[in-house]
Amino acid sequence: MSISLKKSGMLKLGLSLVAMTVAASVQAKTLVYCSEGSPEGFNPQLFTSGTTYDASSVPIYNRLVEFKTGTTEVIPGLAEKWEVSADGKTYTFHLRQGVKWQDNKDFKPTRDLNADDVVFSFDRQKNTNNPYHKVSGGSYEYFEGMGLPDLISEVKKVDDNTVQFVLTRPEAPFLADLAMDFASILSKEYADNMLKAGTPEKVDLNPIGTGPFQLLQYQKDSRILYKAFPGYWGTKPKIDRMVFSITPDASVRYAKLQKNECQVMPYPNPADIARMKEDKNITLLEQPGLNVGYLSFNTEKKPLDDVKVRQALTYAVNKEAIIKAVYQDAGQAAKNLIPPTMWGYNDDVKDYTYDPEKAKQLLKEAGLEKGFTIDLWAMPVQRPYNPNARRMAEMIQADWAKIGVQAKIVTYEWGEYLKRAKAGEHQSVMMGWTGDNGDPDNFFATLFSCAAAKDGSNYSRWCYKPFEDLIQPARATDDHNKRIELYKQAQVVMHDQAPALIIAHSTVYEPVRKEVKGYVVDPLGKHHFDNVSVE
């Protein structure tokens, strides 16, 4: 063979390798999601915001059981099967075998998932003597607010592949509770290694999970980069890489979507919905939200400890005007905490009408005829249940001024807002909720129980025995009709006591590029990309 032919062959080989490399890079599929904010951290046990869950529990972690995407149906997760004892107090889970852990520069796993990981994940939240209990602030708002420290007597390892939960009483929604984000399973081996290294906080900042995506890089307020986890036990993701492009402004998110700089965006401006419907490059998905937007009154602070004052502030607000201006009619005025699409909804409850004169009369009866001043906290981010908190706050401020109540609007960065609100610094604070498991208990107990008042997710800090005497028995019985009746009564009590101004249930819109296939709107408000492809 001549030298020239050799060179020609080498050139062809080189060109072939280049072509293969280019082809591989073209085939590598990346999806960009224009997320609305930065996560508070990467351990879903410690936080309650959907922003954090989208970045942590959804892509990185798994739970013993999961919700089938797009539904509230509970399906096997890390547990492939389970049994419940006849008395409803013992749950036995049989773990999948061969489930791999992710790795990072600090940790290379030496074993698969086992029962030790499950026990550790719950013991950290329950046991104040666990060396990880106080790491990263040690705030387990969901676990504590749902009363789980008292409900769960023991989580014990039966063998390497079997775990048992022993409860102090039957709990109807317990299985669905275990599909929630706070119940994500963390690696005990990773935790032990980081504890020995003197860096336990890395477990919460540099996550190791068993989920479909693995964290590669996080730049606060800029982007989060993930890759598909090659060792994932489930169906492999159809995309190779996923980028969260952190974009707080909804108008900017929409502009990026139009330019194909991202392919999916959450929480569009209501004013942009009509344009999105006409955009031939965008598919606008929608469904009634399993959510509620509300304003909590801190009942530990005067004069909000007086039910007449709370009722007055509620009568004074024109909710229909808010639905038109803030939600652009993409929602409905709320009279109950749970949305009308949820079982147990009490449609017989009569909503507070817009009645400034009635509000003035109630203030007079409360000895506040001349009015008073109050702070009104407005969240700094868009949420599915509140597309424009600042505008809503301004409208409430104007309505209250008409009855002599002067409101000062207050806001903070989202993480700081939640931290201060949990500490009870506010008088009134805008909040909201998207259901986590399809059960009314997830609204009533998580947001307004006495346990939640103590542990932070009850921002009204309202602990009312007649209400508690309805929602607690409803949790304990497996008689569905009995639960419905108890929750209907609870809605009447809550309406009369007005611990919060219940404002709206929104319609949820999800604009996605036409190139995106397989994306499903989640009724629980999460954003799942493990079954999504980009053409």
Descriptions of predicted regions:
Residues 2, 94, 127, 131-191:
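Surface-exposed binding/hinge segments that line
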Residues 30-31, 35, 55, 172, ...:
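Detector for C-terminal structural segments
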Residues 34-86, 123, 208-210:
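N-terminal lobe/hinge region of extracytoplasmic solute-binding protein
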Residues 38-54, 78-79, 105-108, 172-184, ...:
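A structural "hinge/loop" feature
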Residues 68-69, 150, 160-161, 171-237, ...:
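Gly/Pro-rich hinge or "lid" segments in bacterial periplasmic/extracellular proteins
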Residues 80-131, 164, 303:
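Aromatic- and charge-enriched surface segment that lines or borders ligand/interaction sites
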Residues 201-204, 229-275, 393:
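Ligand-site clamp/hinge motif
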Residues 213, 333-366, 383-391:
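Structural transition elements
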